[in-house]
């Protein structure tokens, strides 16, 4: 059994999720990654996730230690992929994943992706897609280790992202 549990985020999680995102911004900056350094994501983005029922938290030892948006509504910018998706199947999307620094290197991000895969399977969805910055090698390694395949690039918020897909 994994040391992490997952649940749908509630309004009560907004401040904690926002703090995790802010902590992740600092971590990325300190590690030379330009991703999330322009103000986004912010509390408003997370509040939108919660309103749409797409926000999820990861708990460890009774504390919220991770946040991600897991959506099944599609991602419009993925329609303009420069490259090729593995499939044309309906898909889940993981956005805005942030893991508390205390859980980094302990399998938290892979566990969150496995949780997202389970949510997909519950909905009879057999594809999951993710995008990240080209300089975020940490996330790219996590994705590769979890069986995601590089598919090309997309433009998101006026920034080019690299896109991955995994068939499940």
Region annotations inferred by a language model:
Residues 99, 105-118, 141-145:
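Conserved acetyl-CoA-binding loop-helix of GNAT-fold acetyltransferases
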Residues 131, 144-163:
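Conserved catalytic-core motifs of GNAT/GCN5-like acyltransferases
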Residues 25-45:
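Conserved GNAT-fold acetyl-CoA-binding loop/helix
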Residues 113, 120-132:
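Conserved GNAT acetyl-CoA-binding A-motif
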Residues 69-96, 101-104:
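Conserved acyl-donor/pantetheine-binding loop and adjacent beta-alpha core of acyl/acetyltransferases
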């Amino acid at each position: 059994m994994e040391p992490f549990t997952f649940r749908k985020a509630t309004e009560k999680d907004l401040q904690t999720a926002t703090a995790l995102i802010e902590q992740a911004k600092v971590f990325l900056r300190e590690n030379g990654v330009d991703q999330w350094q322009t103000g986004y994501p912010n509390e408003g983005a997370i509040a939108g996730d919660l309103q749409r029922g797409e926000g999820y938290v990861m708990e460890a030892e009774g504390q919220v230690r991770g946040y991600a948006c897991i959506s099944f509504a599609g991602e419009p910018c993925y329609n303009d992929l420069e490259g090729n998706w593995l499939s044309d199947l309906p898909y889940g999307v993981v956005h805005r994943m942030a893991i508390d620094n205390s859980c980094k290197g302990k399998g938290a991000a892979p566990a969150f992706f496995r949780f997202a895969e389970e949510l997909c399977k519950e909905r009879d969805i057999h594809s999951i897609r993710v995008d990240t910055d080209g300089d975020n090698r940490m996330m790219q390694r996590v994705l590769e280790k979890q069986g995601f395949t590089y598919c090309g690039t997309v433009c998101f918020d006026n920034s080019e992202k690299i896109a991955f897909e995994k068939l499940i």
